[in-house]
Amino acid sequence: MSRSRASYIASGCIRVAALPLSERLKAIFEGITAVVNEHSPNKVAVEKVFMSKNPDSAIKLGQARGAAIVACANHDLPIFEYSATQIKQAIVGRGHADKHQIQHMVNALLSVDESQADAADALATAVCHGHTADGIAALAVQESRQGRRRRSER
């Protein structure tokens, strides 16, 4: 993401078959590890878990999220968390947008045609981070370090 505009690099979904929970969590961990190894991000933004009407679903979502966070933490990546409302506010301008509105705005902001709702949600979370004070401050620090490196290489 540049200072003025977000740019699309890649997106996708880690799909896990109807395996035992431990195998699904392992697949998520390994999938996120592969993405980190391939793209070398310098930070990660994730959506906070919300309490759903189904407690079992919320617990499983929390476990899957934990597997993804540990995969990133193993690479010493800073992890930023945002609520669904914060993400919707940053992308659509109001905190109660629906999935179609999020998907439409992500496609417009990044000039992509992301038809997978889960991938669009992940991209929305990344764009949200870029639009927040933490995201802007982290980018400024990173650009400052890169500038110092470039000057020292001269």
Where do the PLM segments sit?
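Phosphate- and other anionic-substrate recognition elements at nucleic-acid/protein interfaces
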Residues: 1-154
